[in-house]
């Protein structure tokens, strides 16, 4: 029997061509390969969701599920108490989303009823209160999601306080509003990670 760590990787001495070949083959065998048809379907789904493929694939790999809804904070939607109507550029972005739920979270003093008047949203609910406890945030988000599983929902957030909702709601990912509504979405944030 060998010593502890005897199979911990290649030795530090210069490897022969055969050893390099074996290690490359072993590493390549660890990476999953998807059939071209599956990749095409996932690229098409990412397009329906308005996400780049890298972001969609990352969320899909992390959760093991497809995205069924987006959760938008009223700040991310630029809906304010004086002007609850979503700006035209944001409304067009929401209208372009296909085969996915669009749920708004109204932050006080904006009411969920005012936010729900936007036809681009499928539903609107009150957002967790500012500085609410983790438990209260989780309960509020669970009420907003209804029967939707949290790990299939992506949060679009504007502020640091809103990003905390991702962990509280056990959501799939959190994307910055500027990236989602701006030039394009980059990489998704891990909901277990607090920093951006």
Predicted regions and their residues:
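Extended, compositionally biased intrinsically disordered regions
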Residues: 1-11, 192-196
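Amphipathic alpha-helical packing elements
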Residues: 5, 16-73
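A short acidic (Asp/Glu
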Residues: 56, 68-70, 115-117, 163-168
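Long, compositionally biased
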Residues: 71-103
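Flexible, charged surface loops at secondary-structure boundaries
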Residues: 95-100, 115, 142-151
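Structural motif
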Residues: 105-111, 129-136, 155-160
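A short, well-structured beta->alpha microelement
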Residues: 125-145
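Extended, charged low-complexity segments
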Residues: 141-196
